[in-house]
Amino acid sequence: MKKTESKVSLFIALIAIIIFASVPLWHFDLNANRPQTQVVKKKKPKKKKKVVHKVTWGYPFKRLYEKKIKFKSGQKFGETDIIRRYYPTKSYFHDGYDFGFSEVGHSTVYAVHAGTVHKVKYAPGLGLYVWVISDDGYVEIYQEGFLSITDIYVKKGQKIKLGQKIGRLTGSHIHLGITKTDKKYIDKHGVPCRYYWKDNGTWLNPMKIIEDDIAK
């Protein structure tokens, strides 16, 4: 009887050991069948680089930065109230912009755009002028404002930067003309004034070009 009880007790003990030993396995198996939840780290959005516009045009006089000047019709580009040509047909077209002594004084003239001085010369109607050709195809003519060659600070072949001193206004006004190298702006005498009387796209509005660039 005692032997039988011992065998029963031993059997029960073995069963208990097997049960307890299997618990971790069951736990493992249950976890193995469960879907795994993966934590995904959100990527921080890349900061967009702000594109800063590099100004490449500027006013020919510092005073224009300081205050708004109201120019007269005759000083502005385009059709004006002043006749420019009588024969063979009348024309009121102005091929540039005039900056007068009354607005800017006898002050320093600054380069409105970078480029290379093509010529410093005299021509009837233009007076002493500075002819600049820029790498991007623009052409700038500073004319009618220099009474003496000593009023001009640059020379032929010189590379100039935006805002560099061109000379000094000593006349009544500086006429600034802007065109492009692909335009037929040179007359038969080699002077950069062809179609000065005609609004055919040869000459461009200087103030629009300058102020559009500054405003970007």
Language-model-derived ranges and their functions:
Residues 3-28:
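Sec-dependent N-terminal signal peptides
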Residues 111-151, 173-180:
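Zn2+-dependent peptidoglycan hydrolase active-site motif and core
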Residues 103-105, 148, 154:
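Short, solvent-exposed loop/turn positions at domain surfaces
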Residues 105, 136-139, 202:
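Short acidic/polar mixed-charge low-complexity motifs
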